[in-house]
Design a protein with these regions (language model features):
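Catalytic loop of the DD-peptidase/beta-lactamase superfamily, centered on the K-T-G motif
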Residues: 1-132
């Protein structure tokens, strides 16, 4: 691993070190604009701001990305992560109420449309075999 490449100089995880289950809860909360299990976790306006595109070139808002490059025909909102041989992503489509959290270990750096190839293929396999 090269400092600043596979692990940014500051915390590579934004100091979020969570399980797949915890990431799924975070994803559900954002897909419901700040609500989770009937309670408000963050203000609706804040969740909307975090999801709003600030950088048109990259599709990023404040921590969350909008992309059409993950699943064909879908605009997904989410975030990727990588550090020390771990690759992860959480992405959701709020209108259809679908979402994915995928975590993998390894050092495969191949990409598809800018996403780790293993994660991209896994999300598409889950979508095609379980949802579509």
């Amino acid at each position: 691993n090269t400092m600043g490449i596979s692990t940014p100089i500051f915390s590579p995880t934004g100091n979020i070190k969570k399980s797949a289950n915890d990431l799924a809860k975070y994803m559900i909360m954002h897909s419901q604009l700040g609500k989770y299990e009937g309670g408000r976790i963050i203000p609706k306006k804040l969740s909307q701001q975090m999801q709003a595109i600030i950088s048109e070139e990259e599709g990023y808002g404040m921590a969350l990305e909008n992309t059409t490059q993950l699943i064909a025909g879908k605009t997904m909102i989410g975030h990727t992560g990588s550090a020390y041989g771990l690759y992860s992503m959480l992405f959701f489509e709020p209108k259809e109420k679908i979402g994915f959290v995928v975590i993998s270990n390894g050092c495969d750096t191949k990409t598809i449309n800018g996403f780790n190839a293993v994660l991209h293929q896994t999300v598409n396999s889950l979508y095609n075999n379980l949802i579509r």
